[in-house]
Regions:
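Catalytic cores of histone-lysine modification enzymes
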Residues: 2-99
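C-terminal SET catalytic tail plus cysteine-rich post-SET Zn-binding segment of SAM-dependent SET-domain
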Residues: 3-5, 93-151
Length: 151
């Protein structure tokens, strides 16, 4: 029997402003967790990866796990290639972080105080019509689905 690769992904400390770790999540296989309290309104981590156009994203033959984030109207980031660890931040309909494109960089900011041990989440929902995916975030205000970039 082949041993399963149990190597847990890591956070790139150059991309994170706080002590974070990737670990098992109840929302998905992996999630990102705060190891210290994070105040409201603070930059938490930068989402890094390969820059792609919408056309390149649309034509990707998606593997099992996809780590595509929308930066702005033209550019997307593929976190599976050179990702900072932020690609393991899971979706919630009631997230504790939001993302902003600042000078061609995709940054995650805390929406409220995040406590040590808490899983970091963002809303994956894009403001365009895309494929709907079932959401299992467990938030009290869960919408049940979110729109996803790939078909």
């Amino acid at each position: 029997m082949k041993a399963r690769n149990s190597k847990t992904p890591k956070i790139n400390p150059k991309a994170a402003r706080y002590d974070l770790r990737v670990g098992p999540s109840s929302l998905h296989r992996y999630g990102v967790f705060a190891l210290e309290d994070i105040p409201r309104g603070h930059r938490v981590i930068e989402y890094t990866g390969k820059h792609l156009t919408f056309e390149q994203v649309w034509n990707i033959q998606a593997p099992k796990d996809v780590y595509i984030a929308k930066m702005n109207g033209r550019w997307f980031l593929d976190g599976s290639s050179g990702g900072s660890g932020a690609q393991f931040v899971n979706h919630s309909c009631d997230p504790n972080m939001s993302w902003r494109c600042v000078r061609n960089r995709l940054l995650f900011f805390s929406r409220r105080k995040i406590h040590a041990g808490e899983e970091l989440t963002v809303d994956y929902c894009y403001p365009v019509k895309l494929q709907r995916v079932a959401c299992h975030c467990g938030a009290r205000r869960c919408r049940g689905t979110f729109r996803y970039i790939l078909n």
